[in-house]
Amino acid sequence: GSAWSWMHAHPRPCCTLEQLKELIAWGDVIGAQKDDCSSQCIVYEVLASDVPGTFSLGGDLKLFVDLIRAGNREALLHYAVTCCDFLYEFSTHTKRPESMSISLVQGDALGGGFEGALAADVLIAERGTLMGFPEIKFDLFPGMGALTFLSRRVGVDRAYRMILSGNRYTAEQLHDWGVVDILAIPGEGVETVNAFI
């Protein structure tokens, strides 16, 4: 079977601390079922968004600014570690070694949102969606796995160039380069995932 997580961060479609905790809890629930397949084993974990036109815009920049202004290093570190915890578990399946992760990108995936999409075993994106790492444009870097996840798909040289450019790329470009595994027709992403499963 499959388990779908539909991201719906509020008030902005970014990686809020609440959303990250929910995603980790989602993985824990699936992991707890691995020894009891009496009803149906979860083989596929699908990460998607129900925000039209957006997968995820990445890190919660408002939270960053608020915590930096308040000098709250501990809370900022907690946020960063929580991001890493989710991406690590989603990409390695330590609690669910028999499962496969799928990211369905039906809208923009930027920064940490793109990292989340890249963390999956299979990245399915609708044509015309945009993905990239804009962090360099405001003197940051994507530090939650971007280089590792991207270099596995395109090599270290192209990964560095993509990260340092700050550019956004279409799903079609990324498919040509091997970043996106499967292209879907706009509006048919769910059907494409189900056909893959």
Segments predicted by a language model, with ranges:
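Conserved CoA-thioester-binding segment of acyl-CoA-metabolizing enzymes
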Residues: 1-46
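Amphipathic alpha-helical segments at domain termini/boundaries
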Residues: 1-6, 10, 167-197
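Glycine-rich beta-to-alpha active-site loop
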Residues: 90-138
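Well-ordered beta-strand positions
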Residues: 121-122, 161, 182
